[in-house]
């Protein structure tokens, strides 16, 4: 079982198993097509204290799902190196579909782009990145699965905001609900008040969104006191992004697709390659901050 509450997102547990096969076909020296086929069985475990959005989903769609998923990925890469590129670009488009006949049917699409170019005679490097994502239900499924939502915020996303915390917040009902979304009743037939309402374990945790817009600009420069720059990269950055819902209802920190709700940040970042893997830190200030956004002036990962 996986408990996702530790990732700053709405708390729930799930059991999932499956099997799949992958194919890859080079189209040219720089382009590739991939095809993934996977069968997946997922069980969602909800409780009386689960977020109301999760209870609403399970009331509409159930808690047990079997799906046959197909995913097509196209990529085009002209980067001059895999780590710390200084020129070229990479693009990828991914479309995942749970095929008709599955117990839950949805489509999930993403587009990612990175671009690097030396400027001022190669003394500096311009870096640009962007990502957009869309999640939609189709067929008999009315609500897109919350466990496929997009998340934003963090040192690899929109720096200056805590990881996975941007966008709609998980909310709870004033009264305790069962897995069908119905209020539980006491011995007198009265609805049972939720003692955790207003300060539950889901407070300030994101439920994610069905739309993602994210991007960043990096002005990459060398550190003058380091002779070997191959394992270190520093930059001034500007990031922007957020996740959005289809219908906000009474969700907090929520907006439907609106570029005016993009969050911004700027600052200085540093990444270095160690024997344990890449390490990153950022000093950031934020812009267009919402009242419930969780910010971090210093981040390390």
Residue ranges and their predicted role:
Residues 122-245:
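Extracytoplasmic gating/loop element in the C-terminal half of outer-membrane beta-barrel translocons
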Residues 1-4, 19, 35-41, 89-97, ...:
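Transmembrane beta-barrel strands of outer-membrane/channel proteins
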Residues 10, 48, 59-65, 197-210, ...:
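Extracellular/periplasm-exposed beta-strand and loop segments of Gram-negative cell-envelope proteins
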Residues 18-22, 73-75, 92-94, 112-114, ...:
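Outer-membrane beta-barrel architecture
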Residues 28-33, 80-89, 102-105, 118-126, ...:
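Short loop/turn motifs that connect adjacent beta-strands in outer-membrane beta-barrel proteins
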Residues 25, 76-78, 97, 115-117, ...:
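Residue-level signature of outer-membrane beta-barrel architecture
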Residues 152-160, 247-301:
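C-terminal beta-signal and terminal closure region of outer-membrane beta-barrel proteins
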Residues 1-92, 106, 159-160, 166-171, ...:
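Gram-negative/organellar outer-membrane beta-barrel architecture
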């Amino acid at each position: 079982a996986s408990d996702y509450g530790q990732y700053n997102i709405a708390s729930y547990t799930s059991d999932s198993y499956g099997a799949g096969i992958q194919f890859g076909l080079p189209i040219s020296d720089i382009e590739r097509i991939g095809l993934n086929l996977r069968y997946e069985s997922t069980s969602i475990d909800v409780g009386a204290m689960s977020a109301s959005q999760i209870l609403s989903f399970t009331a509409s769609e159930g808690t047990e799902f079997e799906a046959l998923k197909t995913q097509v990925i196209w990529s085009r890469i002209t980067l001059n190196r895999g780590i710390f590129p200084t020129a070229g670009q990479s693009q990828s488009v991914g479309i995942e579909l749970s095929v008709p006949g599955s117990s839950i049917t949805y489509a999930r699409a993403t587009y990612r782009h990175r671009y690097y170019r030396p400027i001022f005679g190669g003394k500096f490097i311009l870096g640009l990145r962007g990502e957009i994502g869309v999640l939609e239900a189709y067929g008999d499924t009315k609500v897109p699965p919350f466990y496929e939502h997009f998340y934003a915020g963090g040192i690899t996303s929109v720096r200056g905001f805590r990881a996975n915390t941007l966008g709609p917040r998980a909310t709870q009902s004033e009264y305790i609900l069962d897995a069908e979304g119905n209020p539980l009743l006491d011995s007198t037939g009265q609805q049972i008040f939720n003692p955790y309402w207003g300060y539950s374990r889901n407070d300030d945790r994101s439920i994610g969104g069905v739309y993602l817009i994210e991007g960043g600009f990096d002005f990459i420069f060398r550190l003058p006191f380091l002779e070997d720059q191959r394992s270190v990269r520093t930059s001034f950055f500007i990031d922007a992004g957020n996740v959005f819902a289809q219908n906000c209802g009474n969700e907090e920190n929520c907006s439907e697709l609106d570029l005016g709700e993009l969050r911004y940040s700027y600052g200085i970042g540093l990444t270095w390659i160690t024997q344990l893997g890449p390490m990153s830190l950022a000093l950031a200030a934020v812009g267009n901050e919402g009242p419930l956004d969780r910010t971090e002036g210093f981040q390390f990962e």
